[in-house]
Amino acid sequence: MATTPVSLQVDGLAEREVMMVTYSFNQATDVEGQMSGIPRGGKITIRVKALNDGNPDLLNWMIAPNLAKNGAIVFNETKSGNLMKKISFTDAYCVDFVELWEDKMGHYEEIVLSCREITNGSVTYTNEWA
């Protein structure tokens, strides 16, 4: 079974091959299931294949507390290479970084981004940060 080519593209950083991506939104409810809060979200977890060239871009982003970046996770069709889906993020801060190498499992880096804005197609979610 073929896999979908997915890449992480961030302003000023080398493009990376995505192994896993997850993001979610939630809305608080009361004990009866009725909405009691506004939708919340804006964090994206992304696992990428390590470049294995000593490139510390993602780590540098993590340890720079005021460094916001824009970018996208791009999903392309396997056969044609045409754009299938794009998740864009604006004013994203890297708030978690893990690098792991495991024998027979490979070498990867995993980051968590806290984003002011996430866009998936025609849907945009904006965190109203002060």
Residue locations for each model-derived region?
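Glycine-rich, low-complexity intrinsically disordered segments
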Residues: 1-130
